[in-house]
């Protein structure tokens, strides 16, 4: 048998405005609540009931309180006090909860302008030794939805550097082979890493 779930409350379309990351020191937060074909946020929402911030705050009745509103086309812009948002640097999608003027619950998760929701995701396969080329090779693929930046690929075995090389940008789902010349493999725990803009990421660990 199959269960088909149809949400009765589809959630609001929300977008945080402004490019600066939200911190505990943020004094004001502007939130766009998008109007829809069957939804007029200014006419239907109980503004005073709205609370915005981390789900860990708003789920327990806390969060930021609204200060003022303005209308932009079909959308409603709500300015919240920044205090009490609970939003941390690793916040993915802060939450809004509240009520309509008829007392029905509303909620939604907002996109943040400084969060990349379509990142490049590099992954490496198990390295191998190409005897003819006298080189270690490793296949690197981008599983993300955006093109990756050029990266420095490094291979270590038990923490000992085997070699490094650079690969160019990869389109989504594209693959390339990184070649580490004059390198060999030996038994141990192999780690493949990528460094992009100074940030190191482990692409894979393998037992050789």
Show where each model-derived region lies:
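Aromatic sugar-binding surface patches on proteins
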Residues: 70-81, 172-179
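Surface-exposed, short loops/turns at beta-strand junctions within beta-sandwich domains
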Residues: 83-90, 183-188
């Amino acid at each position: 048998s199959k269960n088909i779930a149809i949400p009765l409350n589809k959630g609001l379309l929300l977008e945080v405005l402004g490019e600066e990351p939200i911190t505990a020191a943020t004094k004001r937060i502007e939130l766009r609540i998008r109007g829809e074909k069957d939804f007029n946020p200014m006419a239907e929402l109980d503004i005073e009931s709205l609370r915005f911030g981390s789900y860990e705050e708003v789920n327990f009745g806390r969060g930021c309180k609204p200060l003022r509103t303005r209308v932009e086309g079909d959308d409603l812009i709500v300015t919240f006090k920044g205090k009490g948002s609970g939003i941390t640097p690793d916040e993915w999608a802060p939450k809004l909860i509240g009520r309509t003027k008829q007392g029905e619950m509303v909620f939604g998760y907002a996109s943040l302008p400084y969060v990349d929701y379509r990142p490049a995701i590099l992954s490496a396969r198990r390295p191998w030794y190409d005897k003819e080329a006298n080189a270690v090779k490793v296949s690197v693929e981008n599983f993300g939805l955006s093109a990756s930046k050029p990266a420095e690929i490094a291979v270590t075995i038990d923490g000992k550097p085997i070699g490094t090389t650079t690969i160019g940008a990869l389109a989504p789902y594209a693959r390339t082979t990184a070649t580490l010349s004059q390198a060999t493999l030996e038994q141990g725990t192999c780690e493949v890493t990528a460094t992009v803009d100074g940030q190191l990421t482990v692409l894979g660990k393998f037992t050789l």
